[in-house]
Amino acid sequence: MKSFISLLGLSFLTCHASAHYIFQSFTYKNIQYPPYGYIRVNDNYNSPVIDLASNDLRCNSGGETSKGTQTITVKAGDSFSFTGDIQVYHQGPLSIYMAKAPTTAAAFDGSGQVWFKILDIGPTFTNQVATWNLYQTYTYTIPPNLPNGDYLLRIQQLAIHNPYPGGIPQFYIECAQITVTNGGSGTPGPLVSIPGAFSDTDPGYTANIYSNFFNYTVPGPAVWASQGGSSAYTGISNGNNAATTLASMPAATGAATTATTIVTTTAAGSGSATKTGTSATATATGAVVQKFGQCGGQGWTGGTTCVAGSTCTATNAYYSQCL
């Protein structure tokens, strides 16, 4: 009997863990970069943040500092994507926030009344039945009116599948580091502090999606209303962007070693095409790769030896990661 209970508990924990997810990959100009290349590394695997007073609400546990994450240069008006390790599983809204860094994105911890929201994705109601947009990849646009500078770009999915107060809503969060160019002269807002932007009395936090659930307000500030252009989000339920090239990270410092890479990209409804280009290696061959860094995959010429305590694990034919 004891063995049966232990196995039952293990099964529950395995299912519970598998229902979690993490937005680990960033895409720009149809190039999807390796996990944590431009996204700050968290130290809680795929677990959510649940403490409304915690600084972890900004960029996840362990994401308060850069830890070597690179910063990608993007143009205002261009699209970008966050991709999770699996499809978002729990019902709840998704939001994207930004915060302008006083100096560099890498040096910014996200403190202060600096955060503004550029996107909310709540449920749609048809005949009083809610439908949630649960995707693996979410794509949106850098606001055309956004001033130039360094920013933290924060994705947040709030899981409310286990209603409060019996359950605690779960925040799934990651931050990318970006430098915006070709920007405008808008004034983003309203500005809020994180933590501080969410309360356990917010209707969108306390909502019971299983009882009398006919409308919904996403927690947090209003979305910045003067972003410019006519941006609309898109989502892919399972998998990466169409027409996406999987790429290695450019070298962070010093002269980069380049290699010719041939990759196959698939566009929706257009079959496949072959693209040839050069990509810089993330680490020199033989260098020790830090935890969560890339350590292998098709075309990879960087380091293949993981730091002590980590193992090089294949995610797919194109990407292996130190875990």
Curated annotation (Swiss-Prot):
Keywords: Carbohydrate metabolism, Cellulose degradation, Copper, Disulfide bond, Glycoprotein, Metal-binding, Monooxygenase, Oxidoreductase, Polysaccharide degradation, Secreted, Signal. Coiled coil: none annotated. CDD domains: LPMO_AA9 (cd21175). Residues 287-323 form the CBM1 domain. Pfam families: AA9 (PF03443), CBM_1 (PF00734). Its EC number is 1.14.99.56. This is AA9 family lytic polysaccharide monooxygenase A. The gene is AA9A.
